[in-house]
A protein has these predicted regions:
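Signature for HUH/AEP ssDNA processing cores
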Residues: 1-170, 179-188, 192, 214, ...
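Long, low-complexity, charged/polar intrinsically disordered accessory regions
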Residues: 1-12, 24-25, 195, 201-254
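Short, surface-exposed linear patches
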Residues: 106-107, 138-142, 197-199, 236-240
Length: 254
């Protein structure tokens, strides 16, 4: 069993310089267009571990139009706690920063739509083993209870949408919806989706549309030292995150 631990800067450097395969991420977006217009990094808000301490509690928004090759260079430079892509679609992404700061995306003329996504998070559970846990703590028992609900949640989403993808996020699962109609959903329609998925431990802010960022596939979740990994439903059902080689970074194996 490999531990769930906060990744040190040395761990992050080992991952992004040696193991991280940016081509896998690029291929994933090619299969699930459109490709992101913007990416963002969190240097160390939760762990308080950052290469540049002045960047703690800041979201580092990268320039629009950045290539995947340049994105990897930024990951190696900043060694972030988390790496994200922006689910919003913009007419002019280079002008998006002002509206991002206001968080009033849906009423802005520069806004074209947002990828619908659901964040099923073990942080939303409590059990006898972790009654007093803090946000940064991880409970494997809660995660395994969460995993049991994935097939039901996936089934509900497939009743309404055709293109539903699952990504193991490190502490839970993300459901990505790539149907064209989903991008055009209003805030009210997204809230209705939340209502249908009550009881599945979702973070409503993500699917409601107010949070634009979601984890970059194949990046490192530095809160638990696990690789953000796309999976099929069958792969989810047999997933053992304490031992599955696909989600374990090499620095834990040494």
């Amino acid at each position: 069993m490999y531990p769930f631990k906060i990744s040190s800067l040395q761990d992050r450097e080992a991952f992004y310089t040696g193991e991280f395969d940016i081509e896998k991420g690029e291929e994933w977006f090619e299969k699930h267009p459109p490709a992101p217009q913007l990416f963002a990094l969190d240097a160390g808000t939760e762990t308080k571990i950052a290469k540049d301490p002045e960047k703690i509690n800041q979201i580092i928004n990268l320039d629009s139009g950045i290539s995947f090759e340049k994105l990897k260079e930024k990951l190696i430079h900043y060694l972030p706690e988390d790496a994200y892509y922006d689910r919003n679609r913009y007419k002019e992404p280079q002008k998006a920063l002002a509206m991002i700061q206001k968080k009033d995306y849906f009423n802005n003329p520069n806004f074209l739509g947002q990828e619908l996504a659901f964040d099923m998070d073990s942080d939303n559970l409590k059990c006898e083993q972790c009654r007093n846990k803090k946000f940064i703590d991880f409970c494997l028992n809660c995660f395994n209870n969460l995993k049991k609900k994935v097939p039901e949640a996936y089934g509900l989403l497939k009743e309404e949408f055709k293109q539903v993808e699952i990504i193991y996020s490190g502490r839970g699962f993300h459901f990505h919806i790539f149907d064209k109609k989903a991008y055009a959903l209003s805030l009210e329609e997204r809230e209705a989706c939340n209502e249908r998925l009550k009881g599945y431990f979702m973070d409503p802010w993500v699917s409601r549309g107010r949070i634009r960022l979601i984890r970059l596939p194949y990046s490192l979740n530095a809160l638990v030292s696990r690789i953000v990994t796309p999976l099929t439903l069958k792969e989810v059902e047999i997933l053992d995150i304490s031992a599955d080689e696909r989600v374990i970074p090499e620095f834990l194996k040494k």
